Amino acid sequence: MLRAVLLPTLLAFGAFTPVHGANSPGCGKQPTLTNGVNQINGREYVLKIPDGYDPSKPHHLIFGLHWRGGNMYNVVNGDSIQPWYGLEARAQGSAIFVAPNGLNAGWANTNGEDVAFIDAIMEQVEDDLCVDQASRFATGFSWGGGMSYALACARAAEFRAVSVLSGGLISGCDGGNDPIAYLGIHGINDPVLPLDGGVTLANTFVSNNGCQPTDIGQPASGSGGSVRTDFSGCSHPVSFIAYDGGHDGAPLGVGSSLAPDATWEFFMAA
């Protein structure tokens, strides 16, 4: 077992309070942004507005972040993963999706430049489209997972929840003191970013969210299964899923619903 350590915390957080809660400035407007590649500050992202978009209806805003050596199209097209990490199919038109493109095929986030990029995308999208500002989410695999963690650290007040797939401390953690709903999903035999590193990331929010310390459950190697640990006593939910596998953008295989279902359900319950 890997111990999920409850680090000392200075504040006892109360009941969960949603971030923001206002509708974005784009609500009620006819959009000018279109599906496909858009630009902001010299960088690119792919935008997916749902079919039948209603500008009077607030939508979830979900960022899908690519892995090292990948790009935004890998997330959109579902290269070695389900498209949009399987979340677009589950959203059924309730969400606007964004796949940003990293610099040099990654998310080094030097001096916070990638967090600033996400900030700029959010502002551009929300000025034009109708977003529920209490319903922003981020997910990603590997370096995309590390970047999702960096957003949880630096933008806990702006995002409702993140789902970190096989992530590590590779995009920094500016801040990292505030609570946010956090889901970690990690292979027990990950040779690239080992499991204990994923547990360490989760422990940041075990502490921030005032959770009780809990042992992380693990499946037997070779079982093809997974074990979920839900922490208790948290102001914002924290869960961790250890699965029998390695460094995988699609845990238990592209056809598996493990990560898409867990992520979507976690986001909607956060």
Curated annotation (Swiss-Prot):
It catalyses: feruloyl-polysaccharide + H2O = ferulate + polysaccharide. One of its GO terms (molecular function) is feruloyl esterase activity. It is an enzyme of class 3 (hydrolase). InterPro entries: AB_hydrolase_fold, FaeB/C/D. Keywords: Carbohydrate metabolism, Hydrolase, Polysaccharide degradation, Secreted, Serine esterase, Signal, Xylan degradation. It comes from the Eukaryota. Induction: Induced during growth on suberin. It is found in: Secreted. GO terms for biological process: xylan catabolic process. Residues 1-21 form the signal peptide. The keyword DNA repair does not apply. One of its GO terms (cellular component) is extracellular region. The keyword Signal applies. Optimum pH is 6.1. Optimum temperature is 37 degrees Celsius. Involved in degradation of plant cell walls. Hydrolyzes the feruloyl-arabinose ester bond in arabinoxylans, and the feruloyl-galactose ester bond in pectin. Active against paranitrophenyl-acetate, methyl ferulate and wheat arabinoxylan. PANTHER family: FERULOYL ESTERASE C (PTHR38050:SF1), PTHR38050. Belongs to the faeC family. This is Feruloyl esterase C. It comes from Emericella nidulans (strain FGSC A4 / ATCC 38163 / CBS 112.46 / NRRL 194 / M139) (Aspergillus nidulans). The gene is faeC.
